[in-house]
Regions:
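Short beta-strand and beta-hairpin "edge-sheet" elements
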Residues: 13-16
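Acidic, proline/glycine-enriched N-terminal capping motif
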Residues: 1-6, 11, 151
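Conserved, structured C-terminal
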Residues: 19-174
Length: 174
């Protein structure tokens, strides 16, 4: 689910996507590193018995955005029958897939992005990032895929009306 993370006074600390991987297993993908520290502070204050850690160094992300993003992923993503396929994946949902076949490199694919277009994000272990990039690049050639830098991403995010901490909101925004 996409949501705001708010202080007790209602002002926004961050925005992001919260994934539920299991009964007691969640992943917060936000824009500000401090949000993880804030979650730890809240858990400590409330005496929650939880484990909160940063996974930034353990997960890489490649965004595949645009009208052909689904077709690109369908060329190399294998999904078990018990998981939603790329075609069936709804906004802010994810699946656990593999590259090419059932014993391929494990990946998580979410129907998320920062462009306002049809799009997906592929989450993988850092050791697999080059393989994932190469698969996306090869599958995207027939669609004239183009890498997108942060400046261009910022422009499409603004055009789509998507907010970013420090620009469209801060800890004084409620």
């Amino acid at each position: 689910v996409y949501t705001a993370m708010c202080y007790e006074n209602g002002c926004m600390l961050d925005d992001g996507t919260l994934f539920k991987f299991g009964q007691d297993n969640f992943r917060w993908i936000g824009g500000d590193e401090y949000s993880g520290e804030w979650l730890k502070e809240q858990a400590k204050k409330k005496n929650y018995k939880v484990w909160i850690k940063s996974a930034t160094d353990h997960i890489h992300n490649i965004a595949v955005q645009g009208p052909n993003s689904r077709k690109i992923l369908e060329k190399f993503v294998w999904t078990a029958p018990i998981q939603p396929s790329i075609t069936e994946l709804e906004w802010f949902r994810f699946n656990i897939s593999r590259i090419d076949h059932e014993t391929g490199t494990p990946i998580v694919i979410s129907r998320t992005g920062y462009t306002g277009e049809l799009g997906y994000e592929i989450w993988c272990h850092p050791k697999d990032a080059n393989e994932v990039w190469d698969k996306v690049w090869e599958a995207g050639k027939e669609f004239d895929i183009t890498p997108l830098g942060l400046e261009a991403l910022d422009m499409v995010r603004i055009e789509a009306g998507l907010i970013f901490y420090g620009y469209e909101f801060n800890d004084q925004t409620d």
